[in-house]
Amino acid sequence: MHILRFSDLCAQGQARGQRVFIRADLNVPQDDAGRITEDTRIRASVPCIQMALEAGAAVMVTSHLGRPTEGEFKPEDSLAPVAQRLSELLGREVPLVADWVDGVQVAPGQVVLLENCRVNKGEKKNNPELAKKMAQLCDIYVNDAFGTAHRAEGTTYGIAEYAKVACAGPLLAAEIDAIQTALANPKRPLVAIVAGSKVSTKLTILQSLSKNVDGLVVGGGIANTFMLAAGLPIGKSLAEPDLVNEAKAVIAAMAARGAEVPIPTDVVVAKAFAADAPATVKKASEVAEDDLILDIGPETAAKLAAQLKAAGTIVWNGPVGVFEFDQFAGGTKAIAQAIAESSAFSIAGGGDTLAAIAKYGIEKDVGYISTGGGAFLEVLEGKTLPAFEILQKRAAG
């Protein structure tokens, strides 16, 4: 995928004295008092901003925060807490600028934060008039927000159409590289883990991956539907019986390519979904009518771990059990440890997956951890993300 990279422009001295507009993803969670509860995204945006400042650029940064009503600014929509945290991380004051669409004053070597871009009328619908105005603010547009790469909005797509130069920041470029390594030119065998509560939310991902991967591991409620498709009892477990035919089709598509969807041979069950519910390991064929399947069993986990250790590339989206409760965490822990020990290139994404990676302390052993959420899922579906598409188009001239 050919795109212009901001790091290359900086290295060539092309950013010196230029006005640089960075679209970052600073959409962080806040408590009721507006305090930031988790600042990973702000920290992840710092390298791009530092790069621009060190290159001698006049730097403007913006992001969305929450879901404001376009055209109506409310105090709770303000990026003020983000500006404060960014100031601390950069060791310099980061002024917050409101009503910025018609002009921004910023000198080379300075950085300003432009107020919540989703307050601007026309941002979400990618209004061309707004996009042209924003493009006039800068010499170089930098997209460094993978989390919104799947949305064609004013600050993620429109501005890139009209800016003099449009390029990818280091965070977005790293995502593109990792995705290319994992999906476009994977070292085989390529094994994907797709878990979650519902087949319906990830059906297109399962269908897309079944055409490309050598092993497709399903977990969580998704695995229960696949167990039904394999004729196994699942008791009162979460499943979607109306999607059994779709699950069978995915199994058949994999089998036609000589690949497989491993169905659990043993499971961990309980009579209730609770933190203190006693756990019992059972053969998959012996699940009782009042059982809830809440994890894969140790035999299944060991088989999957062996498969992951032998893989060339691993894509991980979703924990395979209710890992928040320790008695149902064995499967997810075994998979996390196998990925950590595997020599495969691994890419992981999705909120619950990131929580599992943090719980088992394997951050340093995962090849690439995607910050994307919805954007990561759309990549797995085989879609070209709008942000990638426009940057490729601009790079091609």
Curated annotation (Swiss-Prot):
Disulfide bonds: none annotated. Substrate binds at D25, L26, N27, R41, H64, L65, G66, R67, R118, R151. ATP binds at K202, E324, G350, G351, D352, T353. Pathway: Carbohydrate degradation; glycolysis; pyruvate from D-glyceraldehyde 3-phosphate: step 2/5. One of its GO terms (biological process) is glycolytic process. SUPFAM superfamilies: Phosphoglycerate kinase. It catalyses: (2R)-3-phosphoglycerate + ATP = (2R)-3-phospho-glyceroyl phosphate + ADP. Pfam families: PGK. Gene3D superfamilies: Phosphoglycerate kinase, N-terminal domain. Keywords: ATP-binding, Cytoplasm, Glycolysis, Kinase, Nucleotide-binding, Transferase. It comes from the Bacteria. One of its GO terms (molecular function) is ATP binding. InterPro entries: Phosphoglycerate_kinase, Phosphoglycerate_kinase_CS, Phosphoglycerate_kinase_N, Phosphoglycerate_kinase_sf. Coiled coil: none annotated. This is Phosphoglycerate kinase. The lineage of its organism: Bacteria, Pseudomonadati, Pseudomonadota, Betaproteobacteria, Burkholderiales.
